[in-house]
Structure formats: structure tokens, C-alpha cells
Amino acid sequence: MRILFLSRRYFPAISGMSVYAQNLLRELVGAGHDVTMISQYRGDAFGTRVYGGGPPPPVPGVRVIGLEQLGEQTSGDFERDIATMVDAIAREHARNPFDILHAQYGYPTGWAVLLAARKLGVPSVVSIQGGDGHWVGSCCETHRVAMCEVLAHANALLIGGASFVDEVCERLGSDPARFTIVPGAVDTDRFAQGTSDGLPAPHDGPVRLFYHGRVDRRKGVLDFIEALAILRAQGTPFAATISGIGPDVDPAKALAAERAFSERAIAFTGYAEYGSVPDLYRRADVFVSPTYAEGFSNTILEAMAAGLAVVSCHAVGVSDCLRDGENGLLVNPGDIPALAGALTRIVTDTALRRDLAEAGLEECRRVYSWSAVGRQIMGVYERVRHERPATDFSVDLPEDPTCRFRAEPHLL
């Protein structure tokens, strides 16, 4: 099958979308499919600092095309970049026709694939993966209509869990029957500890708390720092690391300084090449993800695969894989005293920490394999490959210049 995969964000940008794309591409190539990936990327200094930027690297067995987000990074002009994506897909289709167009993220990439599918007569698949389900479309009428058209007219919609389906349908009025639930997945071998039981090796010193991913207040990084201040005040020993880049690196460092944390007390380690990420997990005992919402958290799955106990939140995209007291500890998003309480429990109770880590590791190995998820996605391709794309929608979107993402497109 000839597959076009259109990515909103791929390496060197560090994102759950990058990880998802890398693993799916590997599964598609391994199954013998002919795959082309077109990926957007930031080429400007600001975008590179926030997410990591530059053209996508080669991917074994995949034709890779990078498209710089010239519209977004200069003036928040999503429409310019959408037109560029549609033109690139059409050129590749003319060279060798596609059977499936698959977009990662509902807007702008999902809208671009919907337009290209209509133009070329090829069925479309769209993965709803994060902010596209949480806030894109609540920002302005332009993006609301675009998201609603994608959700109504793509040949197939993939989404990580039932809680995310509920949120998207409540917010945008979609039909839940339109969605196919495809959970997140992780390469369990790659993130394995290498110990006999799969858990972190014993070590001297305090329990090591680890935050990894986008450094973003929406991911709870500022709440984590505030909770650590409570732990310190009550005399609970810990070591803490915050790994990654994102829009709130500077505010996070400023808050840590304001709370009088030394650079040794909270280590900010910055950008991490994806190849080095498993070793970061191996230097921790507890993964902390006080997120407000996810599509399906790749980092939580990575932490489970690495045998770490997990502290997170009762949030969309988390509740589909973690259950409080069974394979993790969960608190309400934004409840800093409760977060501090959960961290205190997991730091001071060795048996609890081990029980949660063992349960998470066992479930991760049993449920969240990329081979199973890849087969499920390829099954969706087979189901829709002979369908006609929808044409009963307008290609013209209403103009709404009030959208907050015009000024801060990197947050979309």
C-alpha cells in the first residue's frame, strides 16, 4: 500500500507526536508498505528553542520531505502552510499515487489532508492526538469549523482513549461512533531497565523524581516545582530532575529560583536526543506527570516500561492507562497540596513504590506494544482504502483574526 503520512511535528523536535510517528513508520515499513512522510518543522530560532527545530532526519525505508512552517513562524499564517502541504501531497501523488493519506493532528495537518483527499480522490485517516482535541477549535471560529469538518468528513478518525473521545465530542459536537480507539504504545525493550526484575537498581541517596517531556505549564511543570517546595518544607528528602524544552522553561527556572531551589536540588537538563532518553529514565525512581490533559501520554508509557512508579493526574488521556492506587497515584490537576501528598507517599513508602512500578510494568508489557497498535492502524487503512473521500463540505473557512494562536502558533 502507498501511504502518505503527514506529521505536525517530527524529530529533531521533541514531542509525543515525534515518538508516535517514528514507531508507526517503523511498523509500516516492516509490514512492506511504501511510505512517504511529509513533516512540518520550525526553522526559526524561537521555534527551535521551544520545541527543537530543523528538517526531519532520514527514516529507514521512508521517503522524507520537510516543509518549513514559514507562515506560522513569521505571522501565524496557518493558511499559507496548509496550502504548501496540500501542494506537496499533490506533487508526490502525481509522481506515484497514494492509497491512503494519514494526518497526525486535526489542524492544520488534518485539514490539509482533508483538502488533499478531496482534490486527489484518496481516502483520509486523521489521528487526534493532543491539543487538537483539547483546545484547537475553542480558540476561534476558523479553527472550530476546520476541526468540525475534519471530524465529520475524514474516512477514519483515530484517538487514544474513551476519555478523549468524550472530551472531543462534548467540546465540538462530534459523533462518538466516528472514532476508532487506538491506544498509545511503547517499545518496551528499548526502555527496559536491564535489571532482573525490570525495576530501578538499588542506589544510595534520596528517591529520584523525574519530569520529562515538554516543559509547559499545561503539563504541570510549575505545579511540580510548587509541590517540591512543600516536600522540602516538611523535610522529605528527594532528588528532582526536569528534562526537556518547551514554552515554559524560563518561567519554570524562575519559579525554582524564587522558591530558593539550587541548581543541584532541581536539575534542569534541557533538550534530550531521543536516543538518550531511555538512559534518563534509568537514572530515576519515580516519574511525575502532573498534566492537565493528554491525548495518550507517551512519556507515562515510557516510564511504565522503564519500571518507574508514576504520579500523575485524573486527566483526559491519563485515566485510560493509569488507575489510582493500582498502577499509579493520581490527583486532580492543579491541586498542589494533593500532588505534594502523593509525592510524599511514594517517596517514603518503598513497598508502595515497588508495587505500583511492578503493576505498571506488567500492564505495559502486556497491553501497549507497537506491534499490536501498528496492526490495528493498518487494519483501519485496509478498511477505508477503497472508500471515496468526502466532498460535501466547503473548502472555505470563516475568517476570525481574533484567534490567540495567531500570535502564539507554537502553542497550537
Question: Where are the regions that the model predicts?
Answer:
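N-terminal subdomain of nucleotide-sugar transferases
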Residues: 1-53, 393, 398-412
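Conserved donor-binding/catalytic core segment of Leloir-type glycosyltransferases
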Residues: 4, 201-228, 241
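Carbohydrate-associated surface elements
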Residues: 41, 163, 185
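Conserved acidic donor-binding segment of nucleotide-sugar-dependent glycosyltransferases
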Residues: 324-325, 329-336, 345-350
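Short alpha-helical donor nucleotide-sugar binding micro-motif in glycosyltransferases
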Residues: 271-272, 279-284
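Nucleotide-activated donor-binding/catalytic signature segment of Leloir-type glycosyltransferases, i.e.
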Residues: 253-272
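Short hydrophobic beta-strand element within catalytic cores of glycosyltransferases
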Residues: 309-312
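Aromatic "clamp/platform" in nucleotide-sugar-dependent glycosyltransferases that forms part
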Residues: 292
